[in-house]
């Protein structure tokens, strides 16, 4: 080794080449530099043009390649290579993926790239390789690049200082809010939804002339997100949040339609899906839920989407409520999603969360800056042109002398200097005169120069006015926005469902309809729409309403709304609650399902009474046992009932609950007895009691085997309907029943004979309702009460339903007629009346 080399090595080793540093501080500094690099140069959009660097470079690269919307398509690979070579020295796949997304109609609300070829699909299919696809700028991109050659934005050196690239685009098109943006930086993320261009322009124009406009005012123009895949937004709570704070969550739901099919089947047709949802994955998820039996009721699933749009068909099984099934799909799949908004963008190279007004104001300020820079550029250019033309005009006005001066000059420099001195011209003017062509000396050209100078002076005056007059600048920007709106504005795609809650409740999509709830003695329950039973004349034989097991009989039925609460009172004195729609829908002849499948009753616990209710805030529950005990409890005591039930009444041995009704607190109570007697007394003679109370005597029985068969309150009607087990009944004015004391035996309400059988129900009615009757064999008849005659107390009534010898009438229910669309069917001898005595004979039994 050369001795000099050894000395150099020693000298190098003696120098400090390793810098000591705290690892904590070094990590902190290095990580912050990396984080800011990601934030500023990669992940977050610039607030003025809504673009990340790679998007801006793709657009500018295509622009410098001449690939505007009016030029032929070029291979995508050529664009990617140009961008990568000059502006973005990173992966070609990153550039191509960016370009692909800007060309997808389901990704961007307003596409910035006009793609030709396979650019992927909403099913998640990848775009074809860049060597196969072609692209160019879209028409709307021209508005983002408009006037970029007029010194409207600053340029910086590219990565190797061989080219210059813009740090922001002029972007007359409000891209940040129109197309939105998403990205994940270090410690922060942005997710800005797209909006409707016409709405944005309306809001921008309002803010242009009303600097102090509130966000509430801007909401009159800008309604909320407008996604390229349309769909529906639930409520405006999330919209209000991010409009005001820049952050919020918007619930987006697929648009669906229900097509009714034969055999009680339906098709649920999905025509729009939430933004950024992969359609193929969505369908696979539904299929998986069906396969694992997490969702039941789907018979078939088809994707019938085509060029016309999305169409996902979900065929239901028989008797499945499509609204409930759809609601289950909303809960379990991406048919409903939450779009978490974070309007984070770069403002002066610093990340900032923007509310709606701030985002719009940044756009407006940017456009003012663009307009001022453009105007200054054009003014400078116009003044330069005017300066030259003024010199040419001077020359043409003194053309002979100018020619003579040039002829006598030694050279061009001498001619230039002589002209400058003689006519007080500038260097540029003198050069322009020397460069004049001979044809410019013609009279017509001289006149044209005068006109051109006048135009330039007018232009200069106009440009100077723009710089001095803010109102003029506002008018120019407003007119430009109107032009953009006229070219590219369109109707809103996403529907905003005001007032809807994003929290999914099964009941929200269940139609409100009148239904019949039937209960057998074994506790089997089922629900059937009232429309399943057609209206008949009284005396009809009816239709099969319920199949039962051999040792089971239909015991009762009630008519209620699908959105009513059902209270089940049991022989243990407990009460349970479910919603009426939770009782499974059955056919007229189905057996139903055991109550134990719906409520948590014990093995030996039996249902005794059903009550439908919608309001617990006022009034009372009035109880009657079969042995005649009564009590009343405030309805509010039952507003909260746990799954395991709640004590409702204390029952004595050998007694059971008969019925519970809702009262106002100041009514009259009518209690019917199986022997044909009825007690009428004031409700308030029974004091309000607690839930665990046993009650007081409401009626005394004439016979040991008597029991309570009817319980009504005066608000239910003015006529008392009495029905017997042999299918006969009548209506009597309630005023024919005199007021008695609580605990009395009552007065006659119907004459009981072997032909009538025991009385099974008394009920106050108005007379314009309909009567639903069910026999011991499950046969149901629906009869207008208008066909039941009004008679005196001591009569036996008329035939209501035809029964065979072994059949008895088991239960009745009254309901108001909301819509009579039923067919009437004749009956056998509907006007048959049984023998009666004088109805006015007083046979009161105290």
Swiss-Prot record:
Residue ranges with Acidic residues bias: 830-846
GO molecular function: ATP binding; DNA binding; DNA negative supercoiling activity
Catalytic residue list: 132 (o-(5'-phospho-dna)-tyrosine intermediate)
Keywords associated with the record: ATP-binding, Cytoplasm, DNA-binding, Isomerase, Nucleotide-binding, Topoisomerase
Intervals of motif GyrA-box: 536-542
Cited InterPro entries: GyrA, GyrA/parC_rep, Gyrase/topoIV_suA_C, Topo_IIA-like_dom_sf, Topo_IIA_A/C_ab, Topo_IIA_A_a_sf, Topo_IIA_dom_A, Type_II_DNA_Topoisomerases
Entries under SUPFAM superfamilies matching the protein: GyrA/ParC C-terminal domain-like, Type II DNA topoisomerase
Record's subcellular location: Cytoplasm
GO cellular component: chromosome; cytoplasm; DNA topoisomerase type II (double strand cut, ATP-hydrolyzing) complex
Record field: catalytic activity: ATP-dependent breakage, passage and rejoining of double-stranded DNA
Stretches assigned to the Topo IIA-type catalytic domain: 44-509
EC number: 5.6.2.2
Chain spans, region Disordered: 817-846
Note: Few gyrases are as efficient as E.coli at forming negative supercoils. Not all organisms have 2 type II topoisomerases; in organisms with a single type II topoisomerase this enzyme also has to decatenate newly replicated chromosomes.
Entry similarity comment: Belongs to the type II topoisomerase GyrA/ParC subunit family.
Role: A type II topoisomerase that negatively supercoils closed circular double-stranded (ds) DNA in an ATP-dependent manner to modulate DNA topology and maintain chromosomes in an underwound state. Negative supercoiling favors strand separation, and DNA replication, transcription, recombination and repair, all of which involve strand separation. Also able to catalyze the interconversion of other topological isomers of dsDNA rings, including catenanes and knotted rings. Type II topoisomerases break and join 2 DNA strands simultaneously in an ATP-dependent manner.
Assembly with partners or alone: Heterotetramer, composed of two GyrA and two GyrB chains. In the heterotetramer, GyrA contains the active site tyrosine that forms a transient covalent intermediate with DNA, while GyrB binds cofactors and catalyzes ATP hydrolysis.
Name of the protein described by the UniProt record: DNA gyrase subunit A
Organism name: Mycoplasmoides gallisepticum (strain R(low / passage 15 / clone 2))
């Amino acid at each position: 080794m050369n001795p000099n080399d050894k000395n150099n090595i020693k000298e190098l080793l003696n120098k400090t080449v390793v810098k000591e540093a705290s690892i904590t501080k070094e990590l902190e500094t290095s990580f912050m530099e990396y984080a800011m690099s990601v934030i500023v140069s990669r992940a977050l959009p610039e607030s003025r043009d809504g673009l990340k660097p790679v998007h801006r470079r793709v657009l500018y690269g295509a622009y410098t390649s001449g690939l505007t919307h009016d030029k032929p398509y070029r291979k995508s690979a050529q664009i990617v290579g140009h961008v990568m070579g000059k502006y973005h020295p990173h992966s070609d796949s990153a550039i191509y993926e960016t370009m692909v997304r800007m060309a997808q109609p389901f990704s961007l609300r307003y596409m910035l790239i006009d793609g030709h070829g396979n650019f992927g699909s909403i099913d998640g299919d990848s775009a074809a390789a860049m060597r196969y696809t072609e692209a160019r700028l879209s028409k709307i991109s021209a508005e983002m690049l408009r006037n970029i050659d007029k010194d409207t934005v600053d340029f910086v050196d590219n990565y190797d200082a061989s080219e210059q690239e813009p740090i922001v685009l002029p972007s007359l098109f409000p891209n940040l809010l129109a197309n939105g943006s998403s990205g994940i930086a270090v410690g922060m993320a942005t997710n800005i939804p797209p909006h409707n261009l016409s709405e944005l322009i309306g809001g921008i124009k309002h803010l242009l002339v009303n600097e102090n406009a509130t966000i509430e005012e801007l909401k009159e123009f800008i309604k909320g997100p407008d996604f390229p895949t349309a769909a529906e937004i639930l409520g405006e709570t999330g919209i209000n949040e991010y409009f005001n704070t820049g952050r919020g969550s918007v619930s987006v739901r697929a648009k669906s339609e229900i097509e009714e099919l034969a055999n009680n089947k339906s098709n649920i047709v999905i025509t729009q899906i939430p933004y950024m949802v992969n359609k193929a994955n969505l369908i696979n998820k539904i299929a998986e839920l069906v396969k694992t039996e997490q969702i039941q009721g789907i018979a078939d699933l088809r994707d019938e989407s085509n060029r016309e749009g999305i169409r996902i068909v979900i065929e239901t099984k028989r008797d499945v409520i499509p609204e409930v099934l759809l609601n289950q799909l909303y809960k379990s799949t991406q048919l409903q999603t939450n779009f978490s908004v974070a309007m984070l963008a770069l403002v002066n190279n610093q990340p900032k969360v923007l509310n709606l007004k701030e985002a719009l104001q940044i756009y407006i300020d940017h456009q003012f800056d663009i307009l001022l820079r453009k105007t200054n550029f054009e003014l400078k250019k116009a003044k330069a042109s005017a300066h030259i033309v003024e010199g040419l005009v001077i020359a043409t006005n003194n053309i002979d002398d100018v020619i003579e001066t040039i002829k006598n000059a030694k050279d061009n420099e001498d001619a230039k200097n002589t002209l400058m001195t003689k006519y007080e011209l500038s260097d540029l003017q003198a050069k322009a005169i020397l460069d004049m062509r001979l044809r410019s000396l013609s009279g017509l050209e001289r006149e044209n120069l005068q006109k051109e100078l006048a135009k330039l002076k007018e232009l200069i005056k106009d440009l100077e006015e723009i710089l001095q007059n803010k109102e003029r600048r506002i008018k120019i920007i407003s007119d430009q926005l109107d032009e953009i709106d006229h070219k590219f504005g369109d109707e809103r795609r996403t529907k905003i469902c005001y007032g809807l809650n994003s929290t999914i409740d099964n009941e929200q999509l269940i139609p409100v309809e009148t239904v019949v709830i039937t209960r057998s003695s074994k506790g089997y329950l089922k629900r059937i729409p009232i429309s399943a039973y057609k209206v008949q004349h009284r005396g009809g034989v009816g239709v099969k309403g319920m199949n039962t097991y051999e040792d089971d009989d239909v015991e009762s039925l009630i008519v209620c709304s699908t959105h009513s609460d059902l209270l089940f009172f049991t022989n243990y004195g407990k009460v349970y609650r479910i919603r009426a729609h939770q009782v499974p829908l059955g056919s007229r002849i189905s057996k139903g399902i055991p109550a134990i499948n719906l409520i948590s009753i014990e093995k030996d616990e039996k249902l005794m009474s059903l009550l439908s209710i919608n309001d617990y805030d006022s009034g009372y529950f009035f109880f009657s046992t079969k042995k005649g005990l009564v009590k009343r409890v405030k309805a509010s005591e039952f507003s909260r009932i746990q799954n395991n039930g709640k004590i409702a009444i204390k029952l004595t041995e050998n007694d059971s609950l008969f019925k519970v009704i809702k009262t106002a607190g100041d009514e009259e109570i009518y209690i019917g007895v199986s022997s044909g007697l009825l007690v009428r007394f004031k409700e308030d003679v029974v004091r309000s009691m607690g839930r665990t109370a046993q009650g007081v005597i409401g009626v005394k029985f004439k016979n040991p085997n008597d029991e309570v068969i009817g319980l009504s309150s005066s608000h239910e009607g003015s006529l008392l309907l009495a029905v017997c087990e042999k299918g006969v009944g009548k209506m009597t004015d309630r005023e024919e029943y005199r007021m008695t004391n609580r605990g009395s035996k009552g007065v006659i309400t119907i004459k009981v004979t072997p032909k009538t059988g025991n009385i099974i129900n008394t009920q106050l009615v108005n007379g314009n309702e309909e009567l639903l009757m069910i026999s011991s064999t499950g046969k149901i008849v629906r009869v207008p009460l208008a066909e039941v005659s009004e008679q005196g107390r001591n009569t036996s009534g008329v035939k209501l339903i035809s029964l065979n010898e072994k059949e008895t009438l088991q239960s009745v229910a009254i309901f108001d007629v909301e819509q009579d669309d039923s067919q009437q069917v004749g009956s056998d001898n509907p006007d048959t009346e049984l023998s009666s005595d004088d109805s006015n004979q007083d046979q009161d039994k105290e």
